[in-house]
Curated annotation (Swiss-Prot):
The keyword Transmembrane helix does not apply. This is one of the proteins that binds to the 5S RNA in the ribosome where it forms part of the central protuberance. GO terms for molecular function: 5S rRNA binding; structural constituent of ribosome. CDD domains: Ribosomal_L25_TL5_CTC. This is Large ribosomal subunit protein bL25. The gene is rplY.
Length: 94
């Protein structure tokens, strides 16, 4: 079971996303179900080490957003074209 700590994004847009990536974080979103979508930011290195395992893409993950747990599955992952970097992840509520 994977547990990911996240923070709610305070800023959105291209400039804010670039600042996140420069700070070794990256944007993500949680959507689906009855609740509203939540834009979050994740620590790149922690998630990078988790995504090396195949179970990351098939199991239900726990994302802790401001102390509240969300059960999610990975819907889509975007990677940098040639650097070993994640640029965005979509999570869907399980």
């Amino acid at each position: 079971m994977f547990t990911i700590n996240a923070e709610v994004r305070k800023e959105q847009g291209k400039g804010a996303s670039r600042r996140l990536r420069a700070a070794n974080k990256f944007p993500a979103i949680i959507y689906g179900g009855a609740a509203a979508p939540v834009a979050i930011e994740l620590d790149h290195d922690k998630v990078w080490n988790m995504q090396d395992k195949a179970e990351f893409y098939s199991e239900v993950l726990t994302v802790v957003v401001d102390g509240k747990e969300e059960k999610v599955k990975v819907q889509a992952v975007q990677r940098h074209a040639f650097k070993p970097k994640l640029t965005h992840i979509d999570f869907v509520r399980a």
